[in-house]
Amino acid sequence: MSPTEMISQENYEPGICKIDPWLKPFAPAIKRRLESYKKWVKEINQNEGGYDKFSRGYERFGLNVLPNGDIIYREWAPNAVAASLIGEFNDWDRSKHPMKKDSFGVWEVHIPAKNGIPTIPHNTKIKISMTTPEGECIDRLPAWIKRVTQDLNVSLAYDAIFWNPPQKYQWKNNSPKKPTSLRIYEAHVGISTNEGRVGTYNEFTDNVLKRIKDLGYNAIQLMAIMEHAYYASFGYQVTSFFGVSSRYGTPEELMRLIDTAHGMGLYVLLDVVHSHACKNVLDGLNMFDGSDHCYFHEGGKGRHDLWDSRLFNYGHWEVLRFLLSNLRFFMEEYRFDGFRFDGVTSMMYHHHGIGTGFSGGYHEYFGDTVDEGGVVYLMLANDMLHKLYPRIITVSEDVSGMPGLCLPVEEGGIGFDYRLAMAIPDMWIKLLKEQRDDDWDMGNICWTLTNRRHMEKTIAYAESHDQALVGDKTLAFWLMDKEMYTHMSDMTPLTPIIDRGLALHKMIRLLTHGLGGEGYLNFEGNEFGHPEWLDFPRAGNNNSFHYARRQWNVVDDDLLRYKYLNEFDKAMQHLEEQYGWLSSPQAYISLKHNENKLVAFERGNLLWIFNFHPTQSFADYKIGTEWAGKYSIALNTDRKIFGGHDRIDESISYHSQPHEWDGRKNYIQVYIPCRVALVLSHC
């Protein structure tokens, strides 16, 4: 039965209400969303021929070269009363290539080829020049432009470039099989170099991909790819939505990066920013046709007070075409395997999450504060992507806890595959910042790690790029602080602070990995406890690149202790590949002992034991388990190669006893030293 047929039934109850009966009082609001979604799908089918044609807007709009070398340029600019294409090819003469406007506000010009060669040369500058109803002449970068560059000797504003290389990129590798357990390596191309400068696509391909593969991750999430004028915005102030950042290299060099990753078996996800747009006028979408409301809501509704940016009007036909086509473009042109949607909370609520604390009450998700246009756009985006690309992965960044965010659209959900577990890193930072180790509450830790919605998959992480930014601290820095500058060498004594830091860094990440979700994420460098924070060049730091880089040299130096954390992270990822606990059912926690600071649980045919006690080790400690038989150590955080003390004899096997313990049918007895975690495999 199709969603349309189901919704038409008077007594139809959305599937989400069967999954979570507490949602039944809100069924009318859920059905209203589905009605709105159904209406959009029907109109797209009737007027555009369905998702497939509608989402190929980049083949109709912007500059497109025909097989005979002719160029057709189309632009939606309903407020303009005149328009022309200008550029180096016609000496910026507004009279040479005037455009014609149709009844939908779309401007068009046909530029014949010369002897089969496009009139506009490859890699030359262009603009659209328009006249407003008030008679003002305005020049803009084409909204669908695929490449923009910056010449700081001339202007801070970016230039639109007609990009039509004579040799197209030849793809070598097919996309890999969709991973059943998702282990994401979050990365930023520009900071991925030791040196104090902007890194390149080619450097990332040649130097970083092999690190990611060796560590055992199976997916990469690339940040700051969509073109953004301000480097320090971390890519979140997008100016050209169809352009990829030229500061890292050419489009073909990004294609090579993705192609090479695919050859290594790595999925590549794009951090897509559809939650807002840069307010730049000269090189952005703001005031594109001279009006305040071309792509955005008008007035205050179209502005994000905290981000100082513009907000899309998701309910407009051409805006919807633009955004859905943007997603399709990156799938087709660059062969990305999916998206991490940024700022989903802002898209789903009129208040954008500003000054709002979510209590978890369901009225917060279905009342007047919800922006139905934004929610329905996300439903359409996920529906389109999953219908056209069944192997795609979509991830949402939402702090509100919206029910159904990761349930199918036809069930009344919003259609994402995963949501980020944003409460987990907040918990770890709060513990390290505010509590002594003796005061850590094992029950609260386990509750936060397992507090996720039924049948909605979650990506767990102990820290991401958010915690690395200036003004915050990474886990390693919270744990070891200034001693990272003086005592991370194996040639110096192992101080109590460094010893504690290494131990807890491993345990925090392992517990998060094992208990926190159905996927895992790490921000580049954090796997080895990257020193210092992340700060992009800006006026406030004298435009310094010192903190806008990754110090790979410290993990490559055998004399430094960073290598221990790196080796542990590698072992952890490869163990997950072997046992697949992320794709296993949620763990059964048999032990949360506050006084002893012990946690034990079963997941993925593995028995996990954590001793967070600062000083107390336990001999012959009874650990309950459902499985009878022999156990052996699969992972031990206390190994010397991980910076531990080798206090455990790993040649020993553990045999279960058939007596109930901690609610399990059997138990084993283990030696578990302080600040050590063990993962035991069941033979």
Curated annotation (Swiss-Prot):
Enzyme Commission numbers on file: 2.4.1.18
SUPFAM superfamilies for the chain: (Trans)glycosidases, E set domains, Glycosyl hydrolase domain
A single GO cellular-component term on record: cytoplasm
Chemical reaction(s) catalysed: Transfers a segment of a (1->4)-alpha-D-glucan chain to a primary hydroxy group in a similar glucan chain
Highest taxon in the source lineage: Eukaryota
Chain positions of site Transition state stabilizer: 466
Binding sites annotated in the UniProt record for (1,4-alpha-D-glucosyl)n: 92, 127
Annotated localization: Cytoplasm
One GO MF term: cation binding
Pathway: Glycan biosynthesis; glycogen biosynthesis
Keywords, in A-Z order: Cytoplasm, Glycogen biosynthesis, Glycosyltransferase, Transferase
Gene Ontology annotations of biological process type: glycogen biosynthetic process
Pfam families in the record: Alpha-amylase, Alpha-amylase_C, CBM_48
Active site: 342, 397
Gene3D superfamilies on file: Glycosidases (3.20.20.80), Golgi alpha-mannosidase II (2.60.40.1180), Immunoglobulins (2.60.40.10)
Function: Glycogen-branching enzyme participates in the glycogen biosynthetic process along with glycogenin and glycogen synthase. Generates alpha-1,6-glucosidic branches from alpha-1,4-linked glucose chains, to increase solubility of the glycogen polymer.
Family of this protein: Belongs to the glycosyl hydrolase 13 family. GlgB subfamily.
Name this polypeptide is given: 1,4-alpha-glucan-branching enzyme
Natural source organism: Rhizophagus irregularis (strain DAOM 181602 / DAOM 197198 / MUCL 43194)
